């Protein structure tokens, strides 16, 4: 090969730079340098694929492959920063075991539940699925099919799934994995404010005087937001950081005060703070009188277990979300027992420390930002706990103004934008509407051009009940998309795996990798990831962000959206609706679900010419499907406090926080002058409630369903670590992240280790009546539990720690408590 002098100089310069950086260039690197077309990296924006922070990244592509990512300096969320996971986004799609063709369990050339996985065509895969779905619908009706989706679905994927299940199959048995992470937050938002999602935004980080973390390790789980807290704390000496947790973690390193409390006693701490505010005349009476009402929650509501479970049978008011009106004096009386002494006895936190925390809320000059994630939400009284923190902010009027913000952080990139806003929960419809409300069903049927009575008014099976119905043979056809519930969910051995392997059931898993869930399924569908498709996410501060497809998917992988739409083509309306309903819309006779749901003159309203050249989903359908779905979905919220901008706008900005009215985003909701829906002269307007008033809800401490005993004498808490995300499906396939933290460990207090004759690195058996796992002990490091508690992260597929978790839920939100269950620790010889 001949080289020009200029090319030679460039090649040597590149080699020199590589040598300085300690990198060895391949021999063919000079070829890349000679060809300017090949060396040119194309950059475009996209929201990060990981957590709910919503960082924007710049994605570099070359020769049809993502080769680099970097923090987006124009992004207001992360301002050019990435966390360690974000820096390796370019590698998440290129794991060696990427599934690239549909895989069906086969024996002797036919589907067989006990067969081995074998590659099949998409037509065979989808035709087999359709056959199983039709059989389940014929046997059980709409309740015989189910879908478990994701807070990682794009907005369009989730919306298409809702239409397919709720309008097409007329089944409300669709739920997202956000049920495991955000359902308690949703429940409390709806009870307290009548509308979902935070009233504040990330600008609060630069305005608060005090930060209080209630069960959130932001240093590892939301590290980019943690940098904003760190900057505020280190730049302003008066700012205080408070961290409450059941064990010591990295967020404590910045904290001015750390509070280690007994599991479940956060209920007592929050009630104490409310009592302290009242007893010390710190109630903002002007705010309380104008903008709040008082309610009493129904108590002794059980734990969301099966109806025949003894714990559930003991409850006086199982699963009741009823509330009764009370006066302020009655509320005052309800929190009066929670004195500093009582709360200290219950929590293990000193009276002095409890008062230190309460004073920050009570001081009218201190702007307080409360933050929480799974520690509060994954809780058998998670809705109550969320509400108790809202009570504190409402009593003091510290809400919906810069720096005063009770803020529920999300764990997935579109738990807000897709699971919550789109309404992929079993009881919801888009824009905070619910299936149980006839008016909401009528609105949805009108927008979707469905005959009256199409939508089912009974909420469907939520995540935990879906497992039980599969086990009991009541759901026979089930589709898992964009999650790994066989590793992430609770009580795997007893309630989940039996349903997957039930001979009556057909389980489909759409995933890019052979996860634990995929391996337990009957059909694996290879899925396009992240920038292999066009989409949109919604983050924790109500910011909607969109991105274009930037590379093509590996092999035969297809997006979840393509899969949903192609599947819908295999059902004629007569096969799923029944004659009575079809008779109301005779023009639909002979049409497919695809024709009715996605070729309805709205979803297909935008021509292919409007889409980018690289848009495989649009090309497959022959129209700009992402824009059509988004605009139809957005029509639910416009004019109703959930306004989204036109779809094309999101491709020109780094996201906008809804409601977006007249092109302007909203930073603080409910506050006059900031929120366009707040009435003039109202000052604050909680317009989700008919009278514009938020609720202060009294709820007591109630014990968890299980506590340690003589046999199972330790608490187990499960969660995450910085380097891995959820079940590690993506991060464990990034070599640098895998090498950094290859294995899950059992973090244990040195005194507990000594009692059991354990040393760091010893292998132990963690067990209870639901199962056992083998894991190595860690007595040092980032996580330091108190005596009596161990922490084990759940990213490691070889250590299915969540099999030990009881499938008890908050009866109101149906969210599982992954933060506390009794276990015993035994040394393995």
Swiss-Prot record:
Transmembrane segments: none
Methyltransferase in keyword set: no
GO biological process assignments: cellular respiration; Mo-molybdopterin cofactor biosynthetic process; nitrate assimilation
Principal location: periplasm
One Pfam family this sequence matches: Molybdopterin
Reported modifications of this chain: Predicted to be exported by the Tat system. The position of the signal peptide cleavage has not been experimentally proven.
Enzyme Commission number(s) of this protein: 1.9.6.1
Binding site for substrate: 794
This protein's UniProt keywords: 4Fe-4S, Electron transport, Iron, Iron-sulfur, Metal-binding, Molybdenum, Nitrate assimilation, Oxidoreductase, Periplasm, Signal, Transport
GO molecular function: 4 iron, 4 sulfur cluster binding; electron transfer activity; iron ion binding; molybdenum ion binding; molybdopterin cofactor binding; nitrate reductase (cytochrome) activity
Protein name: Periplasmic nitrate reductase
Source organism of the structure: Aliivibrio fischeri (strain ATCC 700601 / ES114)
Gene: napA
